[in-house]
Regions:
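N-terminal amphipathic/basic leader segments beginning at the initiator methionine
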Residues: 2-31
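Alpha/beta enzyme core
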Residues: 3, 23, 39-41, 47-341
């Protein structure tokens, strides 16, 4: 249907969208999607045996943190208005079953207590997986050996549940199972409830793809698999209907929130999830998404601030209530600057 009636100077244009784009104040008044620091989650990497900060080469501006540096980072986040973190650990030792993941004195458990000491109101989300703690780098324990080794789904569930309980006992508000083991949410919910942690929420990595965008993270967390890949348990990025089934399954098992990862390549799934459920939806703007923007900006090809904010708006516009992003602190500062204008 034409939006122009008539021709020439007397033409009547039915839609004058530019009327509401004339000034920054008008554009702000009618903006449909609004970012706020409270919806941003900063991922943090906690390094055992360290006190300071160790830059992550593949992720400019991000560091591995010792416990003292972690507490300092909490103060920086608070000042920026970022009130939620997602924790990953780098243990001092690894073994075949990833026992450091559920140790009472594990690095993430110690990190949770350190954060609680300086910021009791911080929302602490703890990742639940074994890949950073296993000597082989897979997200569950192995059955078989050599070329016949496979990840044992059901045996891994017990260890993931034990890890979630340990993290809850340390003080995590939310546990986030990311191993993509079938039935992990149900196993974790049952274990939390049995241990008296009925108020600990579950943010399920419901649709986690076997993505090429995870490369920088695996350097940051020292979690690359020693052999093979994770395609037998992480999802094929080509499968949208399967992602919706995974989301439905995690909700049926007791997830309080669901996460989709990576974010920008999966905006269709974020939108589909938003139409499908009323629970909070998180999207993870992963390391490769972050580092690609950093690299392009460092070469002068893109405006770091503009591209980062536009990407976050796109994720929110698709339907995400929560965005896990390495830009969290920077974005919070940019949003405050915009609000003062």
């Amino acid at each position: 249907m034409s939006l122009v009636v008539g021709t020439g100077k007397a033409a009547h244009v039915a839609l004058r969208g530019r009327r509401l784009r004339r000034t920054p104040a008008l554009r702000g008044l009618v903006r449909e999607t609004r970012l706020h620091p409270s919806m941003l989650v900063q991922p943090l990497f906690i390094q055992a045996g360290a006190t300071g900060r160790e830059p992550i080469a593949a992720m400019p501006g991000q560091d591995r943190l010792g416990l003292a540096a972690l507490q300092g980072e909490a103060m920086r986040l608070r000042a920026a208005g970022v009130r939620s973190v997602l924790l990953f650990g780098l243990p001092s030792a690894k073994d075949a079953i990833g026992s450091g993941a559920w140790a009472a004195d594990g690095i993430v458990q110690e990190g949770i207590r350190a954060l609680r000491a300086v910021d009791p109101e911080l929302v602490i989300i703890a990742d639940v997986c074994l890949c950073e703690y296993t000597s082989h780098g897979h997200c569950g324990i192995l059955a078989g050996s050599g070329d016949d080794a496979t990840v044992d789904n059901d045996t891994s569930l017990e260890l993931l549940a034990r890890t979630a309980v340990s993290l809850a006992e340390a003080g995590a508000d939310i546990v986030a199972p990311s191993a993509m083991m079938d039935g992990q949410v149900a196993a974790i919910r049952a274990a939390l409830d049995e241990a008296g942690h009925g108020q600990t929420a579950i943010l399920a990595y419901a649709a986690k793809h076997a993505s090429a965008f995870y490369g920088p993270f695996r350097e940051a967390a020292d979690s690359a698999p020693a052999f093979g890949d994770r395609r037998s348990y992480q999802m094929d990025p080509a499968n949208g209907r399967e992602a919706r089934r995974e989301i439905d399954a995690d909700l049926a098992e007791g997830a309080d929130m669901v996460m989709i990862k990576p974010a920008l390549p999966s905006l269709d799934l974020v939108a589909a999830a938003r139409a499908r459920t009323d629970v909070p939806i998180a999207a993870y703007q992963v390391s490769g998404e972050y580092s690609a923007v950093c690299a392009a900006a460092a070469n002068g090809w893109l405006d770091r601030r503009a591209v980062a904010l536009e990407s976050l708006v796109a994720i929110a516009r698709a339907g995400a209530d929560i965005i896990v992003t390495y830009f969290a602190v920077e974005a919070a500062g940019w949003l405050r600057e915009e609000a003062r204008r």
